[in-house]
A protein has these predicted regions:
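Membrane transport/envelope proteins' first extracytoplasmic loop
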Residues: 1-185
């Protein structure tokens, strides 16, 4: 019975990662031209490559004694790697600089959902963003903020936003700060 349960859990996890196109390689960079992606995609063994913007922002929520932060991750234009599973709402309009999707655990910890606004500091500027959806991601099953040993969804959350808005907020027009790759088996 124990081996059967383990095998079932192992297969379920593998299928979840496969269905949601979980990346094999994650690389942070300070700033790289997005045009570099074409060269990376040509490397032998790379099945798919995606250039993203991944940046920290600070939470500006009433009632929080200790500072909190969010990790902004740009949404891919197409099917993309590390697909989101929407629990509520919808994905942001790709042309919007104000719409976001937030991680499920973070949403529950703060009682937030579609239609609510989230106040954050992005690159030193305060912004109020409209939550359009709540999602799960294979990349952030356990979301750990800077210096955290254990997940604390009250103090750290993941926020997905359209690329254009993050490019403007973090002065990364035509650039990326993170690369993810799917490799051939």
């Amino acid at each position: 019975l124990g081996n059967g349960a383990y095998s079932s859990l192992h297969e379920t996890r593998a299928r979840y990662y496969q269905d949601n196109r979980f990346a094999d390689v994650f690389a942070d960079v300070t700033r790289a031209p997005r045009a570099l992606l074409a060269e990376i995609a040509e490397i032998e063994g790379v099945l798919d490559a995606e250039a993203r913007i991944v940046k920290l922002g600070l939470l500006d929520l009433e009632g929080m004694k200790d500072p909190g932060s969010v990790l902004f991750v740009s949404l891919p234009g197409g099917a993309g790697l590390n697909r989101l599973y929407l629990r509520e709402g919808r994905l942001p309009d790709p042309l919007s600089a104000e719409e976001i999707v937030i991680a499920d655990g973070f949403a529950k910890a703060h009682g937030l959902g579609p239609g609510d606004r989230l106040a954050v500091l992005m690159n030193g500027k305060r912004r109020e963003l409209l939550i359009t959806g709540v999602a799960l991601s294979p990349e952030f099953i356990y979301a750990l903020g800077p210096g955290q040993m254990m997940p604390d969804p009250r103090r750290f959350g993941v926020v997905w936003a359209p690329r254009a808005g993050l490019e403007a907020a973090y002065d990364l027009d035509g650039a990326c700060s993170n690369l993810v790759l799917k490799l051939a088996p």
